[in-house]
């Protein structure tokens, strides 16, 4: 919590000089056990070779075994630093065109890559040349370790597989106030954000696309980006990118890349993330919002089908690194493309902010993607990374170093997940009885594709399951099935003590086998932290606690009729009652032993409503630090628009210095910096601040430990 931070305290009394904290950090590198020298071998020579190898091999590589993905960094700088003057790196000048030189560097790196691959009998996954020169290999760990003796090799590190980190926010954080500034609102205009994720559904209305399912279906058949004149996307919003993975890629098999980075229908993570950062917004009529953002009051925002992203005028690149499921080893390749998205050797189209809502738990400090993040920071690009969501501790993220890499990269702006004052909830519409007709809050089952269902499929009469099988965990008898046929079944979700007798899929399958059209579940929570899966063949809705009693009574009476629909998903905005609480699953980062702590700040990430892939105009709610990071990416774009000569150091400092809203748990206890960073983000204050304080010895980390 920020009130204990030396640098924040100084901000409050108006210091205008950079604070030199003189922090010294040291990292211990484990050494191999001593071995007996070979007969006749010069021991001094052998000692020198061991020392060289230990400098080149990362700590994790020293112990690695078997066939693994590895990044081999070659000596020297990447093409960007080799060809661009210092003023460009400091964001004081536009990049110079050095295409011929960049192409020569690329050719040299590709030649080196083939050489090391042949020497180690490994397969080339990809090469990098813009950020730093190197190659990703898949091969035997020992054979790749032997490359450490090559004079052109600087560092060898295992690649750690990365996973996806699964409208009120713009009001809570002051982002909407920045849209309404006099003369010029700060909406991210002129700033390019690269989203490294599962792709973007650029046909969605939130990004200016046609907003139809037919347009999405047409776009998914292409292996190249459609022409700008095709009408399938808005070139003012979406600038293109690459699919580095292919639908079937899962991190273990071979990627099948192409030039069309559209999201997968069974994915949607990247689409949601992109909308949170820079979606135009979708109005109540399902049209792309093309109006004046400065006129959007909280009331008008609440009426929109999808609220704008935090930087609605920013432009987007998509670098797809995930298939439709599974992990990825391709993040380093995507980071290399951030500096030259179209690959022509001209860096004038580079992104200034890169969002990564991905990572891995407890990954080592020597992850090569973290090196790339640090290098990009030096080259003028800020990486905004989700802190991560705990998966191995019953959803509780209060475990040191849980967040892993690249969230623990020193220069990254690492974002924890806080609760906003309001959140979006799905709605169902009660059609009968008339005395309780209207919308009720809850959440839709996840595995069913509502966008392709007919209106008739998503409505019907609801009857209660028999008391003897009220949880639906057992198969329904023939007698019960006769009562459920062609109706929806109301099932109790949990026991009175909150325990759950079986999972949702079992219940949905039992209901389907009995001939039911859909499932309605009760709930003992107003907003559940975790969703319900259901199954792929019948729809389902879990009713919030506040509406469960009346739904139960009318279902038992046989008078309840209900409707679901894409137009109702995310259709309610309710008060959370938990403003500025930290979400319990938000992962804790490093504790300071390495000379710094993580995360850096927090942003709203609970029940965030954003664009849903393949729906045209629909929305979906996700919770996690994956949703917090893109909101912060949009704020970074606002700050850079307001201060166009800011370097990543200054952007990060402005955002951390101004994030002075304390976060607390459900009991009101305030969190310390090693769980939430400096505090909850404040977009308006980040733009307004003129006093930037950061660690003079290590400015990339901003704060002291």
Task: Give residue spans per PLM region.
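Subtilisin-like serine protease catalytic core
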Residues: 33-34, 65, 83, 149, ...
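Autoinhibitory propeptides
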Residues: 2, 21, 33-37, 111-192, ...
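Short acidic, glycine-rich surface-loop motifs adjacent to enzyme active sites
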Residues: 338-365, 386-387, 486-496
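Structured lumen-facing ectodomains of secretory-pathway proteins
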Residues: 205-214, 220-226, 235, 241-242, ...
